[in-house]
Amino acid sequence: MKEVRQLAEGIRCFSEEKKPEMENFLASLVNRESGSYDTEDVNALGDFLVKVCTEMGGSVTRHRSRVHADPIACTFGCKDNPDARRILLVCHRDTVFPHGTTKTRPYTEDEKNCYGPGCADMKGGIAIGIYAIRLLQTIGESVPVEIIFTSDEEIGSEASEEFVKCRAKNAKAAFFLEPARANGALVTGRNGGDLLTLTVKGHSSHAGNAFEDGVSAVHGIARVITQMAELSDTPAGYSTNVGLVSGGEGAIVVADHAQARIYTRFSTLEQREFLLSRFKAICEANTQGGLKVSISAPVGFLPFLPNEANHQLFELVKVAGNAFGLSLTGVNVRGAADAGITSCAGVPTICGMGIVGGNLHTDREYAVKASLPERLNVLALSIVLANRTYA
């Protein structure tokens, strides 16, 4: 068994040699469209990644989704024992950017950073995950590892959540390759979040001649969303944002329909249940006088909570970082992501193991080029150490 110092040296040699190749691979990923709602694009990127992983000797599992693009898992080092416990690497291949973005804003770079849609969130993480597996194969470290490419993380993981839960059943540990913070910090905790659709139905009428015959869904939804927004308690760690409202046909028509999109943020599962129960009560209380008020089932993210198992994995990652002269730190963030899926399932989990970057979800998104080999080093050594640590 190689010592940590010997392993680190072999890993460093690989990453330094492959840095230009990795940058080219990242550029090819960024220039492939994969907006969350563009199913064909996200599946096409999935096809490309399946080809890459198959050529590396991976075994592919693909779930055909009826709601969004397909989540995919590629497994390595498990052919002799398909049920072997393995290390999970989890990436999402969708971005927030719609089809056509790469034509007007393709991958570019300067001396320090690279730019382009999803370069940090999270195509940089995909590149690091793929090359971590290649690295381990090259240096002769036989580790059962599975890389998951989810399809819809940016819109709530409706197609991917159950897939990740299922794949986590045989997991020793899970590394989520979301970008590290701009200062290089890893992510050791995240809020949960839900997306919901509020629907109000009323009765239309002429707003002048027959105003009293109508039941306004727009007036109704105004009351309901005000009551829901008032549930927010930011110091306690939960909030309700009504981000999109629509309804009605025109100013001279009493509206018979209205709809709102709501995003909740919460720190604990108990807070999530509180918000959902209050939403239900508000809908029931306002279903009267000809109004019908309903809210959809939540689609979103479980909270990624700090716990002892996750802390131990973070300490292991810090050991890996120290081997390359890095003093890694961890932060809890408000933004939700998929790490809560494995953490809530009892799998030691850490997030932010991808490329260092910032200005996510904007046309100014960037990734730090020097962090590509740097974070590859940390991930590869962390995989080996986790495989040795967890039975």
Spans of features found by a protein language model:
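Active-site metal-coordination/substrate-binding segment of hydrolases
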Residues: 83-146, 155, 169, 368-369, ...
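Acidic/histidine-rich catalytic neighborhood of metal-dependent amide-processing enzymes
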Residues: 122-191, 233, 387-391
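Metal-dependent amide/peptide-bond hydrolase catalytic core
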Residues: 1-10, 17, 34, 61-64, ...
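Acidic, glycine-rich active-site loops and adjacent beta-strand->loop/helix elements
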Residues: 93-95, 148-155, 178-181, 204, ...
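Short glycine-aspartate micro-motif
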Residues: 86-88, 114, 172-176, 197, ...
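Acidic/His- and Gly-rich active-site-bordering loop/insert found
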Residues: 2-117, 138, 321, 339
